[in-house]
Amino acid sequence: MIRVLSVFGTRPEAIKMAPLVKKLEEEQNVESLVCVTAQHRQMLDQVLEVFDIKPDFDLNIMKERQNLSDITVNALSGLYDLIGELKPDIVLVQGDTTTTFAGALAAFYHRIPVGHVEAGLRTNDRYSPFPEEINRRLTGVLSTLHFAPTKRNRENLLKENVMGKIYVTGNTVIDALRYTVKENHVFEDPILRNMDFSDGRYILLTSHRRENIGKPLENICRAVRRIVEGFEDVKVIYPVHMNPAVREIVFPMLENVERVFLIDPVNVIDMHNLMARSYLIMTDSGGIQEEAPALGKPVIVLRKETERPEAIEAGVAVLGGVEEERIFELAKKLLVDREEYEKMAKAVNPFGDGRASERIVKAILHEFGLSDPPEEFC
């Protein structure tokens, strides 16, 4: 019996780990344990409820206005003690959060193998995204098994001469969509529940990254105002992150703008179904860059660079940056040029086929001599 401890702490991690946790629970050769740090308490709990995941351990480190040092210290201390007590055969971490890095480091201190889900994403700019780029690089150094979503991610790891074994699996976020997107979905959020998505074109907007707080987010808000002023059939829905630094910018700039709907963050099922009903998505989220192509939705990436260049190369996304004029012009083009819109909407999703969790479980079993290796995602 392989004891697998899955560690995560934020909503994006939970969305991507949930289908993997469900697969691990089905495997008779695995004892699956889950620890959450609750780095993002409220939004994490939404995902756990949706996927019916009950953590075995909850470190509950969330504090108001905590800084990165607080998160790192509290997560590392709690995880070090827990891993020492449980002595798992492998610790799984996901992505690039502070919890990810702390979990990998705590496992390393106990000489326990680390499996890194979503390994090998890179922008090659240490401050963008911040602190995620360094978190995932350091996690890569500490990991024994690297579950790379794409071949490009594997190439990034090989260039860095990482130790351990690399498996190309696809991204587990595509697996999650199989659980969540339903044609007859009834929204939990009351504002969304009362919307007629057949009336006009809806743009889904999300922006919350640390590097965008300040002038970049102000530029994004100004571009949004111009978009709704220029297109009478367009409505913008913005689930605004609970971070006070984000809300202090967004609400004064957009709260009273006609056809812009500012709502609280929604649960993952509402979010995925909102994406499925949107005409266009504007986002600085990494996960949404992966999810939207699976739903046939063009994406304007509100960042200067992306660690997911596969989306740009496949033609499912375009790099919008954080300048007002460029964001507006890109949105305008997709709203006016039907041919350009269709070209992006119908491009092939480069991030997965819905079987990433299955491949990761099989890879873990293979490493412990209980299975053949999985077939690669390509």
Swiss-Prot record:
It catalyses: UDP-N-acetyl-alpha-D-glucosamine = UDP-N-acetyl-alpha-D-mannosamine. CDD domains: GTB_UDP-GlcNAc_2-Epimerase (cd03786). GO terms for biological process: lipopolysaccharide biosynthetic process. The keyword Secreted does not apply. The keyword Isomerase applies. Keywords: Cytoplasm, Isomerase, Lipopolysaccharide biosynthesis. Its EC number is 5.1.3.14. GO terms for molecular function: UDP-N-acetylglucosamine 2-epimerase activity. It is found in: Cytoplasm. It comes from the Bacteria. One of its GO terms (cellular component) is cytoplasm. Pfam families: Epimerase_2. Belongs to the UDP-N-acetylglucosamine 2-epimerase family. This is Putative UDP-N-acetylglucosamine 2-epimerase.
